[in-house]
């Protein structure tokens, strides 16, 4: 089993996509990259943390390259601190790696993707230093709240788009 931690906008959206994938064992939303011991309120108030999803996966069933490819399909890696209507540093695009092999793979992936994108890719690659699990009510949010307004307006269409691709 391996882990990768991704930030690409609202963590509810990112988790909703990855928790459905074959080979993904578990997902957990949290915060990384800012002040210690964050809360949702402190993150929304700009404490420097990023909304992220920790993805625990079986590399025999799904590769990191497949995960990163999907990650770049579900968010805009050329947008600085913004995804759709979600604006703020907590929504920046980032790949937190745990080992050098994953770092190199991510760097090579972005280099190849840049040949496809007309705008500059701003996704950062950084070693995971600290990770804080988000509050329980954020975990598996779409599964637990499928009829909530944001879920219907933003997450459900994203899932439909991915399924049709």
Swiss-Prot record:
Signal peptide: none annotated. It catalyses: L-methionyl-[protein] + [thioredoxin]-disulfide + H2O = L-methionyl-(S)-S-oxide-[protein] + [thioredoxin]-dithiol; [thioredoxin]-disulfide + L-methionine + H2O = L-methionine (S)-S-oxide + [thioredoxin]-dithiol. SUPFAM superfamilies: Peptide methionine sulfoxide reductase (SSF55068). GO terms for molecular function: L-methionine:thioredoxin-disulfide S-oxidoreductase activity; peptide-methionine (S)-S-oxide reductase activity. Its EC number is 1.8.4.11. Transmembrane segments: none annotated. One of its GO terms (biological process) is protein modification process. InterPro entries: Met_Sox_Rdtase_MsrA_dom, Met_Sox_Rdtase_MsrA_sf. It holds the Pfam family PMSR. Keywords: Oxidoreductase. The active site is at 10. NCBIfam families: msrA. Has an important function as a repair enzyme for proteins that have been inactivated by oxidation. Catalyzes the reversible oxidation-reduction of methionine sulfoxide in proteins to methionine. Belongs to the MsrA Met sulfoxide reductase family. This is Peptide methionine sulfoxide reductase MsrA. It comes from Campylobacter jejuni subsp. jejuni serotype O:23/36 (strain 81-176).
């Amino acid at each position: 089993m391996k882990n990768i931690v991704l930030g690409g906008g609202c963590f509810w959206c990112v988790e909703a996509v990855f928790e459905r994938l074959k080979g993904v064992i578990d997902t957990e939303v949290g915060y990384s990259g800012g002040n210690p011991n964050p809360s949702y309120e402190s993150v929304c108030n700009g404490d420097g943390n990023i909304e992220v999803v920790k993805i625990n996966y079986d590399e025999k069933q799904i590769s990191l390259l497949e995960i990163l490819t999907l990650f770049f399909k579900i968010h805009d890696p050329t947008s600085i601190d913004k995804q759709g209507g979600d604006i703020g540093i907590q929504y920046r695009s980032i790949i937190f790696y745990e080992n050098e092999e994953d770092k190199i793979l991510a760097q090579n992936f972005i280099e190849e993707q840049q040949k496809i994108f007309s705008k500059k890719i701003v996704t950062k690659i950084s070693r995971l230093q600290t990770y804080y699990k988000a509050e329980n009510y954020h975990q598996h949010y779409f599964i637990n709240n499928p009829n909530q307004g944001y879920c219907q307006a933003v997450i459900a269409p994203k899932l439909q788009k991915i399924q049709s691709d």
